[in-house]
Regions:
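Membrane-proximal low-complexity regions enriched in glycine and acidic/polar residues
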Residues: 81-177, 181
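Bacterial N-terminal signal peptides
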Residues: 7-18
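N-terminal edge beta-strand
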Residues: 24-40
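Extended, hydrophilic extramembrane loops/domains of integral membrane proteins
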Residues: 179-209
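Sec/Tat signal peptide C-region and signal peptidase I cleavage site
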Residues: 19-23
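Juxtamembrane interface at the cytosolic side of transmembrane helices
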Residues: 235-248
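Short, aromatic-rich amphipathic segments at membrane interfaces
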Residues: 175, 198-228
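Short edge beta-strand/loop segments characteristic of extracellular beta-sandwich folds
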Residues: 47-53, 173-175
Length: 248
């Protein structure tokens, strides 16, 4: 038995006895509740696993797992070409765009939930509430933001990312890239049957800076002048050292 399946079986055996699963509809857990961003952080994989109530089991049941990060303001600029030179053109600012958003499901979202339900639940990239600050909303800026975040692996959809084991157990793997920002994250699990959400659960996840990375961030924000001087000094020293080595 693979490790994810073993975890799922252990979860089912332990929680089915200790918790009234019938009342909740779904039980779930994360492989870790905290992700530490260190100096050499290259990303982290998060395992989401759980089980649905017996009365919800069956081929008509689907599971959707999403992970959302803290909101952050983002400016999207359009490049324009003038006299053969590319320059910054019109821009649009999104005040509260998710810094990270990933969603996985047992089947493509459009076959699980109607477009109206996806908009209401804000599930899927097309249904994210991305509202620009400007008076006139240009859909090209919204799509450009989604494309940019997707290329950075900060946005993503996996239409078959949730795996079912038997009729009740499920698990999904979500990847947090190195560019994620610290803060509170939330995992949402939806159990869908016949186009309706019949059970749900949310789990908190925290991304924190740790070690040297945390100290550098603290100095940069608490003592920006000292940080700037140190950065200039280190850059100058690196340049001098490089010239000496190449001279030899």
């Amino acid at each position: 038995v693979s490790a994810p399946v073993a975890w799922l079986l252990a979860l089912l055996a332990t929680l089915a006895v200790a918790t009234p699963l019938r009342a909740q509809g779904v039980l779930a857990e994360l492989s870790q509740r905290e992700v530490a961003v260190t100096t050499g952080f290259a990303g982290a994989e998060l395992l989401v696993f759980g089980t649905t109530a017996a009365e919800l089991a069956g081929p008509e049941t689907d599971v959707i797992v999403s992970l959302r990060g803290p909101n952050a303001a983002v400016v999207v600029r359009r490049k324009v070409r003038i006299a053969g030179i590319w320059l910054n053109g019109p821009s649009e600012q999104f005040e509260a765009a998710p810094s990270f958003y990933a969603v996985s499901s047992t089947r493509p979202l459009e076959t699980v939930l109607s477009a109206e339900e996806r908009r209401r639940l804000r599930i899927g990239l097309a249904s994210l509430p991305l509202s620009p600050r400007g008076q006139i909303e240009d859909p090209t800026f919204r799509q450009a933001l989604i494309d940019l975040k997707t290329s950075q692996r900060l946005f993503g959809e996996d239409p078959e990312g949730v795996r079912l084991v038997g009729d009740r157990l499920f698990h999904a793997r979500l990847f947090l890239p190195s560019a994620v920002i610290p803060g509170p994250y939330r995992v949402d699990i939806l159990v869908v049957r016949d186009g309706r959400v019949v059970a749900s659960r949310d789990l908190p996840l925290t991304v924190v800076r740790a070690g040297t990375s945390a100290e550098i961030w603290r100095v940069a924000h608490d003592q920006p002048l000292a940080y700037g001087i140190a950065a200039v000094f280190l850059a100058a020293f690196a340049g001098w050292l490089g010239s000496v080595l190449f001279r030899r």
